[in-house]
Amino acid sequence: MPAESGKRFKPSKYVPVSAAAIFLVGATTLFFAFTCPGLSLYVSPAVPIYNAIMFLFVLANFSMATFMDPGIFPRAEEDEDKEDDFRAPLYKTVEIKGIQVRMKWCATCRFYRPPRCSHCSVCDNCVEEFDHHCPWVNNCIGRRNYRYFFLFLLSLTAHIMGVFGFGLLYVLYHIEELSGVRTADTMAVMCVAGLFFIPVAGLTGFHVVLVARGRTTNEQVTGKFRGGVNPFTNGCCNNVSRVLCSSPAPRYLGRPKKEKTIVIRPPFLRPEVSDGQITVKIMDNGIQGELRRTKSKGSLEITESQSADAEPPPPPKPDLSRYTGLRTHLGLATNEDSSLLAKDSPPTPTMYKYRPGYSSSSTSAAMPHSSSAKLSRGDSLKEPTSIAESSRHPSYRSEPSLEPESFRSPTFGKSFHFDPLSSGSRSSSLKSAQGTGFELGQLQSIRSEGTTSTSYKSLANQTRNGSLSYDSLLTPSDSPDFESVQAGPEPDPPLGYTSPFLSARLAQQREAERHPRLVPTGPTHREPSPVRYDNLSRHIVASLQEREKLLRQSPPLPGREEEPGLGDSGIQSTPGSGHAPRTSSSSDDSKRSPLGKTPLGRPAVPRFGKPDGLRGRGVGSPEPGPTAPYLGRSMSYSSQKAQPGVSETEEVALQPLLTPKDEVQLKTAYSKSNGQPKSLGSASPGPGQPPLSSPTRGGVKKVSGVGGTTYEISV
């Protein structure tokens, strides 16, 4: 009966149990009302006491057999039997006391039934040690309620026998009064008791045999152990004692409980969470705990609102407040950096945007270099279309920034003091400009019009190749793509950019330049160094050409003599500077000599006149032509001999700086001169061709350029 609470109500299944209860209670009531008072007078007053105790015992066992759980197994959940539902065999065999016992798969409850378990078709449940389904008690008889059913049968049989016997005794005492009410009622009760005694007594005897043999009604009816040995029997006495005296079996079904709603009154209200302490509940593998953290609600809300896939914050901007002279250029560098996003330029990692430049200079000059590199990064990344196209060719080579220091902003020179011996980009033309009073306006025009594409080429090639080649450091304009760089629109020049990547040999050479050998010689005049046209724009080249025309018209300075070995000298002195040598960017020209024996350190030679490397074009000067001669590539300068005044010991001391491998690179790297094949620039021209360089006479030197153009330079 406890199993049908959740199912549809069926009145038919309550008819047998209701009839049994009515007959039991009704007959006993009539017996106590009409028969027991006479028996107490004639026989003994203990008769009604006995019948009362027996009736109560019968009624108690009847109630227990009806309302008690017989031992129902709970059904498997849907997620528990997914794997076993369709692939399970019908039977499984287990061994109990050496006997094979089959377990059948229950498709309704979705598990293998244990031994002696069967599925009740009426209750629709699998019952442990299923005996039978009794309609008189409206319940299955199983392991948990079989004891009460068996006692009910025994007590009912005894009660029926007592009612029938004591009623017969009453009739015998009142045989003359058979028509009386008491005698008639006693005869009716005897008929009912006698009617139910036959089946009840037979059922009781059957179960006594089953208990003695250790079997169930289901096993006896189906004949499971009819021809064999019952593995579940323990002997007659043990079987009886197990049924009557053993402890009750556990209950597998939980008792249904209704959910209770508890209303919290004001003394039990939850306190508000304070800012100082927040309780966090943690659910991890079914374990609850409370973790107290000292965080404010505002901080927790911010943490929870942040997405897990949010981008990290940008890196902090550099603090330029402590550097003087940089605030004016901050807006320019920022605008140029933002304009690079829309251009098709080589990808550069963000970490290099504010990377300081490393050089071989002294420690005192590290801070100016780093600050200048921060601002000139955006300038050097501006690339015209021709540079972007030419960078795809395999012949593109990286070059360092070799622009003269005069191109830098004057504020840098005032704010940061550079070591003249450690700075490798100071040109000789700037020093001569200081001696001749070169105007600041022309410097500003050159700075605004000129450009240096090698700075960007070195940066772009760092992304492409990852390193700098030694020959490209020595010959920046040897690449055929250099002409395409100058043909494009010229961006603003970088402000004091210094290449942060220097090769080992270049660092060694600069170390030698920092500590040159000083030869105590007097000030002598020397030939001007060749002009580096590869780092200048078309406007500057045109200005230089105009300056050369002015030099031809002016008379030569007194005391200037031709010295063939001073063309490639890399060290000079300004008037009044004594013997303090200074390195210049034109010292790289000395490395271009085919023999590579020109020493890096030279005696101090004064320089007069306006410089060739910083000759600017005036306001009214005409625009330059489409082609400009590259005097730095003239064979007359590359074929000059070493200065005879330099001792042999100095050459031997500086000879290890250029190894035979470097000499081979120097020879092969200059197969082209001024963008022309080597055959056109040979030392011995064929008949009918003008010589590339003529001997110097009268302080005027003739130099032939591209296309047969001849230039006269006053020396």
UniProtKB/Swiss-Prot annotation:
The modification Omega-N-methylarginine is found at R617, R697. The modification Phosphoserine is found at residues 247, 296, 299, 345, 380, 398, 406, 409, 415, 425, 429, 432, 529, 554, 621, 684, 694. Residues 104-154 form the DHHC domain. The active site is at C134. Residues 35-38, 170-191 are extracellular. Keywords: Acyltransferase, Cell membrane, Immunity, Innate immunity, Lipid transport, Lipoprotein, Membrane, Methylation, Palmitate, Phosphoprotein, Transferase, Transmembrane, Transmembrane helix, Transport. Residues 442-478, 668-677 have a biased composition (Polar residues). Phosphorylation regulates association with endocytic proteins and its subcellular localization. Phosphorylation by LYN during fatty acid uptake leads to inactivation of the activity. Autopalmitoylated. Palmitoylation of the C-terminal tail regulates stimulation-dependent plasma membrane motility. The modification Phosphotyrosine is found at Y91. The modification Phosphothreonine is found at T294, T303, T348, T350, T411, T436, T659. GO terms for molecular function: protein-cysteine S-palmitoyltransferase activity. It catalyses: L-cysteinyl-[protein] + hexadecanoyl-CoA = S-hexadecanoyl-L-cysteinyl-[protein] + CoA. One of its GO terms (biological process) is positive regulation of pyroptotic inflammatory response. It comes from the Eukaryota. Residues 359-373, 422-432 have a biased composition (Low complexity). This is Palmitoyltransferase ZDHHC5. Its main location: membrane. It is a multi-pass membrane protein. Belongs to the DHHC palmitoyltransferase family. ERF2/ZDHHC9 subfamily.
